[in-house]
């Protein structure tokens, strides 16, 4: 009875230690991807927050071209003072296997000096691909997430007002040709290159589908032999993508955003014992203007302005602190927090730790 209990306990510990994920969560099918679309159009119906046409002549030119296509002729030399129109760029993504008549979301962004696109309506805008072919037509009311108000020279703004979205705002008019179903092989691409994971996925497919069904070509690509025909390949991929593989531990990595000062690390990061001293150097420059005037008004003196500059240099910190060896993410966080460093200081500390061989991780600065 005791032996059975211990066996069950060991099996439970092993199953909880190993993390299994589906192949579909780790890979994508090569060639099955989105395609970017772009277009140029006009937004109308703005509440006086559109482009200043004297500074954005392309807005007036676009409006004249559109009116002429509708049979309306604007006299030459007419100075149209428009406030409710804005020139915009429209972007969208054409999904894989997108069919004619299907709707997609679009993003609308101001091109000129419009103050806000809130309440505007995008007029019919053709969306083109890199081959200059029209694949979709966009039109509809824009939803802007920000808000703002101004009066008496003061203004308040929350979030961005010069961009918005139109949900299901474009209709697909042309389908992209697809090579899916052509040939007897397909390539699965790993989201992150990993030789061991690529080989493990190939071995898993071979165990279920037979030896030679899958081959790992490199650290990112697994070539799979599939039956011919669209329906047969769909069924084959559906079975393969639901197979589960044991995920190997990730590479230890620390990602630093130099613009925002944020530091992110995964659970594989470890620290070796080291000593850290971090000092802050601040320089303050204060400049004042001293005015010197003569005591006697009729003595022929002259008022003189002399600048006075004061420079203050302060250096704080610098005491040597010990950092213990840490093998788990929680201990790493505690060890770094014990230094009392700001995120900006932490970036320099982590770089120095890696140079000294104390940080067991890849350091990536974005």
UniProtKB/Swiss-Prot annotation:
Record-stated family: Belongs to the FlgI family.
Quaternary structure and interacting proteins, as annotated: The basal body constitutes a major portion of the flagellar organelle and consists of four rings (L,P,S, and M) mounted on a central rod.
Name of the protein this chain belongs to: Flagellar P-ring protein
Gene Ontology cellular-component annotations: bacterial-type flagellum basal body, distal rod, P ring; outer membrane-bounded periplasmic space
Stretch forming the signal peptide: 1-20
InterPro entries per UniProt: Flag_FlgI
GO molecular function: structural molecule activity
Species of origin: Escherichia coli O6:H1 (strain CFT073 / ATCC 700928 / UPEC)
PANTHER family: FLAGELLAR P-RING PERIPLASMIC PROTEIN FLGI, FLAGELLAR P-RING PROTEIN
Keywords: Bacterial flagellum, Periplasm, Signal
GO annotation (BP), single: bacterial-type flagellum-dependent cell motility
Main location class: periplasm
Upper lineage: Bacteria, Pseudomonadati, Pseudomonadota, Gammaproteobacteria, Enterobacterales
Pfam families given in the database record: FlgI
Locations listed in the record: Periplasm; Bacterial flagellum basal body
Functional summary from the UniProt entry: Assembles around the rod to form the L-ring and probably protects the motor/basal body from shearing forces during rotation.
């Amino acid at each position: 009875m005791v032996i059975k209990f211990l066996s069950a306990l060991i099996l439970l510990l092993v199953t909880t230690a190993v993390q299994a994920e589906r192949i579909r969560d780790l890979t994508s099918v090569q060639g099955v991807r989105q395609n970017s679309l772009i277009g140029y159009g006009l937004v109308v119906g703005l509440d006086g927050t559109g482009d200043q046409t004297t500074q954005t002549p392309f807005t007036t030119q676009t409006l004249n071209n559109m009116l002429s296509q509708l049979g309306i002729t604007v006299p030459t030399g007419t100075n149209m003072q428009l406030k409710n129109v804005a020139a915009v760029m429209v972007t969208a993504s054409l999904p894989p296997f997108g069919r004619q008549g299907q709707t997609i979301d679009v993003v609308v962004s101001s091109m000129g000096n419009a103050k806000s696109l809130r309440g505007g309506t995008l007029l019919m805008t053709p969306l083109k691909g890199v081959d200059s072919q029209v694949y979709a037509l966009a039109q509809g009311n824009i939803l802007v997430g920000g808000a703002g108000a101004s009066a008496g020279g003061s203004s308040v703004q929350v979030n961005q007002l010069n961009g918005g979205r139109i949900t299901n705002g474009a209709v697909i008019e042309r389908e992209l040709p697809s090579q899916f179903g052509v040939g007897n092989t397909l390539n699965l691409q790993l989201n992150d290159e990993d030789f061991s994971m690529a080989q493990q996925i190939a071995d898993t497919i071979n165990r279920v589908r037979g030896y030679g069904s899958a081959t790992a070509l490199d650290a990112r690509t697994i070539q799979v032999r599939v039956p011919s025909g669209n329906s047969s390949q769909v069924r084959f991929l559906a079975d393969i993508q639901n197979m589960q593989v044991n995920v190997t531990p990730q590479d230890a990595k620390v990602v630093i955003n130099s613009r925002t000062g944020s530091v992110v690390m995964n659970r594989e990061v470890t620290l070796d014992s080291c000593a850290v001293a971090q000092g802050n150097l601040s320089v303050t420059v204060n400049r004042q203007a001293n005015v010197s005037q003569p005591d006697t008004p009729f003595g022929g003196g002259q008022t003189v302005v002399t600048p006075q500059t004061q420079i203050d240099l302060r250096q704080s910190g610098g005491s040597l602190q010990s950092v213990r060896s840490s093998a788990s993410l929680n201990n790493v966080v505690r060890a770094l927090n014990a230094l009392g460093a700001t995120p900006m200081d932490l970036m320099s500390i982590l770089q120095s730790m890696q140079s000294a061989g104390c940080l067991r991780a890849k350091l990536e600065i974005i």
